[in-house]
Amino acid sequence: MTQRGKTRDGVDPAVLERAWVYLNAVAERPSAAMWDAIDTYGPVEAVERIRTRNLRSDPVLDRQTEARAETIDPGELLHRAAEAGARFIHPGRPDWPEYALSALDRPRVLRDRLGSEGSDDNGRRKKVAAELATLSLIPTGLWVRGGPAELALVSAPVLAIVGTRSASQYGRSVAGELAAAAVGVDAIVLSGGALGIDVAAHNAALAAGGETAAVLARGVDQFYPSANAGTLSRAAESAGVLSEYPPGTGVTRYRFLDRNRLIAALSGATVVVEAAARSGALSTARWAGALERPIAAVPGSIHSRGSVGCNALIRDHRAIAITSAAEVTGLIPAHRGPYPHETRDAPVSRADSAYSGSGQPTPFDGLDDSQRRVFEAMSGSRWRRPEELVADSGMPLRSIRSVLGGLFAEGLVERREGMWRRCRTKPTAVQTSLTF
């Protein structure tokens, strides 16, 4: 596969950087349609086509970028990043983690290969194309706060340690032991900066005198959760705090799920320490498996809800059981190099990977991608007009209005004088006769 971001010679680096910033911010996720346009036109011309709505030949990308096409200011985003001590890296730069992230393009590789073979293979290409509509692929840029001048994750061995936010003392202790063992073989400990297992792994790596990095599900200008701000500040001084989301981007559930693919891709191996049956950490494990990276899980008590997910990974032969801290060191590749990326089908659909951490049914069960994005952009306490949901959901207004109607019919949102919010309790009566 050719390196991401190759473009025509003679483009000013500042112009190129602003083009990538625009592409990074204009769509909610880096889709196949976005990358097809970048590969066809180059990043600078792709930006011009999106801004001028010259996308008649690509209605999918037109829909994905319509909501933000005229509002993105790359200069302002770069300024906000600089104020937070962050920088922007993009494909084509020497510090871009090309080897690690290239496997995220596998769905497009499979689609193109099936097309070149000249057969639909019983509808397989159509299925892959449908999955590509909602899958996040290679990010179009990363915002990096702190860390060395050249991203350490590019060349150093990396171990991801992930798990539940509701960690037990056992889970926190094991996460710390695994992190210390990774540091002992000069590996960077990577996690998501969350409460529970994540912060235990970060802190243990730092305490052992090693390096740690965090991948956030929001902009790096504000650390989240605030309770972990101290740990995240130290991680920024270590290997860095990263995000694919521009400064000012807030937290939503689907951004956590999209973020998990980056943790899996940037790591040489992934260990799940504690995870409930529907833990988001399991989506990281799924991505690691789809990218053909080693997966391990820490077995736990059959009576512990926090170990149900880990025990299932081991039972189903999707992860090896870790029975001592020393065992984890054998999973970590000694160096970073090309990963296989054309030998396996696309990862499972995002809908199948949309886990919550509670182990209980959630309002997201049964919702498609558009419905989840609108629902996440809403508040349970503050009424909002449909126009206010455009930026947060990354969807055009007409689509938001349509989705609100469906959510209303399901009893998940309520309306008052043209404004909307999430229902605090789900109504039992069927709601009809909705007008905008």
Please identify what each model-predicted range represents.
Residues M1-I89, E410, E414-R416:
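Long amphipathic alpha-helical segments
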Residues M1-L16, E28, G92-F436:
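Glycine-biased, small-residue-rich flexible motifs in mid-sequence functional cores and linkers
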